[in-house]
Amino acid sequence: MDKINIRNFAIIAHIDHGKSTLADRLIEECNGLEKREMKDQVLDSMDIERERGITIKAQTVRLMYTAKDGKVYYLNLMDTPGHVDFSYEVSRSLAACEGSLLVVDSTQGVEAQTLANVYKAIDSNHEIIPVLNKIDLASSDPDKVKSQIEEIIGIDASESLLVSAKSGIGIKDVLEAIVSRLPAPSGNFDNPLKAILVDTWYDTYLGIVILLRVVDGVIKKGMKIVMMSSNAAYQVDNIGIFTPHKKIVDQLSVGEIGFITASIKELSDCKIGDTITEEQRRCDNPMPGFRTIHPVVFCSIFPNEAGDFERLREALKKLQLNDASFTFDIEVSSALGYGFRCGFLGMLHLEVIQERLEREFNLDLTATAPGVVYQIISKNGILREVHNPHDFGDVQDIASIKEPWICATIMVPDQYLGVVMSLCNNKRGEKVDLSYSGNTALLKYRLPLSEVVFDFYDRIKSISKGYASLDWEMDGYMDSEIAKLTILINSEPVDALACIVHKSKVEQRGREICLRLKDLIPRQQYKIAIQAAVGSKIIARETISPYRKDVTAKLYGGDVTRRMKLLEKQKKGKKRLRAIGNVNVPHNAFIQALKIID
């Protein structure tokens, strides 16, 4: 295939601006699927993507398009996620392409994630074509959005394409712009094979499947290939492309995107961003690869049935292959048994992984409250990274604690600016910058990550009636006043209920948790004391009263000492029961007790 006729492009946008719908129309226009096979969000293969109306995994498809000049072009389309938690998927997709369609909702205008994604495309040296979607709606304002693109993003929007992905208006113009305005891939067919590993997933029959982009040379069936980071060698069994159906081909050459299978069983051999080359004729230098992504939110996941531990381990391994951005390690809890401490890119990422575990692997799970990574510096100068309250250590040995901060970009209509700034200030935020484009404010704030990851996104959407948008990136660590809050039930610490809290909120948090546990734990035959403590200091307490049996009911008249004797006997029995009895805490109590209330 002549690389001059290949175009590799990604579709990038803020969440809900119509990326997946535009992808559907492009596939339809190029006859990628027959009419009877077409459905909404055709590239969103997971049920959870369809139900939530979001893209989670970047997807690829090859289309054939006969342009007005009579030439046949091969278009490799990458549909990318729009939510901030999945921005890593966007970065990987952009590395495989030369150009991007920047889709902007012409009724909403530029939003925070639009900015973040377009800057990633600019960093990847992409040619960018602005596409203004939803022009058939009465509230559409293309001229205003064009000026926003030029003012806020700084790219020329005079040749923006006006489309309605839902009704199909302007789709041919998009295809013509792709072939005329986006560059063909560079690279040399005669050079040794050099391909970048873009994604991996697990297939029950084929083992590990690799999605790759060929940069130089050619990859053929039967060829011996090498993963340059691990030096692992495999023989290629199958080569294919997505149309969007899987289609087996003989080879992939310069500029092409497709998948290979090679009976790979070792997960560690397939690192996202690795360079693949031919064993007999290796390329000189590997590709720079992708930036290593680190989880920022951690929580523990436990199977409700002890016998499901191994099934959970296998499920996590398979999901990690398809999503290298989340991590897991074994954890043992005295309250919940054996489970895993898992790391995620954000709260939506956590919810999606937990939901996939329960749906795809039929597991019944309990997840503890999420937390972030703190840096603890001991008095002898040793730095430890801690995301689990159990690893906090002795307070006496700690010199200082640092917590992660982020830089948030918030775009909000000016009538909601006051309430949004008030929320940021309540979350210990520091204002960095405020600018305007028309009646839209562009707000930059520095905030502690622990205040943002839980419900900040939902709160921003709620107080702005859905009009505000948020994007954020890590901005280093800062010294902070942090304390470990321990919850005791009948003087016994419960590890699953421990959490790390800022000292300004520790008393309020302790009282909240104790009050919730009082409602959640069923009454027993003896008194239950629920306490919140920081170190050895008790800062909050609630008591669950026992059931009371009237042991004196059978008495009538007689000596008062008989009555006292029976009550004393009951008291001794309850004391003995409390000493040997375990308080049964329901599974859902752990999550409900740790939920944040403002």
From Swiss-Prot:
GO BP field: positive regulation of translation
Catalyzed reactions per annotation: GTP + H2O = GDP + phosphate + H(+)
Keyword field: Cell inner membrane, Cell membrane, GTP-binding, Hydrolase, Membrane, Nucleotide-binding, Protein biosynthesis
Entry EC number(s): 3.6.5.n1
GO molecular function: GTP binding; GTPase activity; guanosine tetraphosphate binding; ribosome binding; translation elongation factor activity
UniProt KW Cell inner membrane keyword: yes
The tr-type G domain, residue ranges: 4-186
Residues annotated as binding GTP: 16-21, 133-136
Cellular component, GO, one term: plasma membrane
Membrane topology field: Peripheral membrane protein
Protein localization: Cell inner membrane
Broad class of enzyme this protein falls into: hydrolase
InterPro entries noted in UniProt: EF-4, EFG_II, EFG_III/V, EFG_V-like, EFTu-like_2, G_TR_CS, LepA_C_sf, LepA_CTD
Family (UniProt): Belongs to the TRAFAC class translation factor GTPase superfamily. Classic translation factor GTPase family. LepA subfamily.
Function statement: Required for accurate and efficient protein synthesis under certain stress conditions. May act as a fidelity factor of the translation reaction, by catalyzing a one-codon backward translocation of tRNAs on improperly translocated ribosomes. Back-translocation proceeds from a post-translocation (POST) complex to a pre-translocation (PRE) complex, thus giving elongation factor G a second chance to translocate the tRNAs correctly. Binds to ribosomes in a GTP-dependent manner.
The protein's name in its UniProt record: Elongation factor 4
Organism: Ehrlichia ruminantium (strain Gardel)
